[in-house]
Amino acid sequence: MAKTQRLDIVTPEKVVFSEEIDFVVAPGADGELGILPEHAPLVTALKVGTLRVQQGGKFFKVAVSGGFMEVKNSRIVVLADTAERADQIDVERAKAAKQRAEQRLNSKGSEIDVHRAEIALHKAINRIKAAE
């Protein structure tokens, strides 16, 4: 029997995923990290990106908007600001959020918070890419 590891993806609102998996690739702060069973203990920051999860020979994606990941004793815990399985993403809503962020960035007003608009744009693009 192939070795597996537990993956828990948790947000402040809910547990998004909690099952045994074969492999995960996560968007670490310094680049992508591939985690196999019995990986060395690790704690890292996550950036906005997509978790790619292999479970039972099939792959699926989870869009995350930053957070932290801990790997210990063949258990992976992802504490994310937000997390959404690709098959549950409302693409039209994500496209609308992208358009709003682009409009804010293109506005000439001085009251715009450019940093927040850039983050919103990056998150919306990530959700759209994950759903593809």
From Swiss-Prot:
Asked if the Swiss-Prot or TrEMBL record annotates the protein with the keyword Membrane, the reply is yes
- What one GO molecular function would you report for this record? ATP binding
Q: Which InterPro entries match?
A: ATP_F1_dsu/esu_C_sf, ATP_synth_F1_dsu/esu, ATP_synth_F1_dsu/esu_N, ATP_synth_F1_esu_C, ATPsynth_dsu/esu_N
> What keywords would UniProt list here?
ATP synthesis, Cell membrane, CF(1), Hydrogen ion transport, Ion transport, Membrane, Transport
SUPFAM superfamilies associated with the record: Epsilon subunit of F1F0-ATP synthase C-terminal domain, Epsilon subunit of F1F0-ATP synthase N-terminal domain
- Indicate the secretion signal residues: none
Localization: Cell membrane
Q: Is the Magnesium keyword given for this protein?
A: no
Q: Name one GO cellular component term.
A: plasma membrane
Bilayer topology: Peripheral membrane protein
Any Pfam family: ATP-synt_DE
The membrane spanning regions, by residue number, are none
Q: How does it assemble?
A: F-type ATPases have 2 components, CF(1) - the catalytic core - and CF(0) - the membrane proton channel. CF(1) has five subunits: alpha(3), beta(3), gamma(1), delta(1), epsilon(1). CF(0) has three main subunits: a, b and c.
The family annotation for this protein states: Belongs to the ATPase epsilon chain family.
PANTHER family on file: ATP SYNTHASE DELTA/EPSILON CHAIN, ATP SYNTHASE EPSILON CHAIN, CHLOROPLASTIC
Task: Describe the task this protein carries out.
Answer: Produces ATP from ADP in the presence of a proton gradient across the membrane.
- Identification of the protein by name: ATP synthase epsilon chain
Gene that specifies this protein: atpC
